[in-house]
């Protein structure tokens, strides 16, 4: 997906929010993979990754998978130390009510994240005219420079909840945030601590399950329920206001997260490039009514 194609898309939804310091933002509506193209396993889950190819995946705000994401030993792998193009990735189908399961393994000192109900969001830097004065010895001139409008993608994590992926023993985020543990693995990043904290250490596989049903969200880590919360009501607003995404600290993030999933209350799954090596496997989802 190229920027010019987004600007031309007739399905784009535009909104202006005075609460976000007058910033105009756009939510791109792009082609999605049809679920009929996916394998359904014996438990009724759609397989989002088959361990062989990256069908259905692409970079956030891109029309391809960045080269640092690859397949290694049957797992979806991010090569944090390697050369090439990085960036977050998404699975190109939006889900509303679901049971989402996967396993992750993080490198020593590593950090990543699992996104759900994500939207591709961009802000428009308007066209403008600048007048500049140039001098070269006795010669001077006033030149008018026109700058075209520019579309800037905003970080995926300001549009949706994030389930943290972290080496709790070594990464400094494990001790940051308003409450100890609020940025540790499987927490609702910077909002709710995962209790009990039963993550396995770096280099070992951890199992995560995330359920969403009419805005009721639950995180499970290694088959244990660790947190639950309700989207789109006062509880959600209070969580946002007590986090780094508060209306005061980050108006655009607050506006987008307050209405995460958009008017249709659905969005993409995604994985974060935080610069560290990470692996994901057994990625599957069951659609629930």
What spans do the regions from the language model cover?
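Bacterial Sec-dependent N-terminal signal peptides
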Residues: 1-22
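Carbohydrate-interacting regions of secretory-pathway proteins
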Residues: 21-289
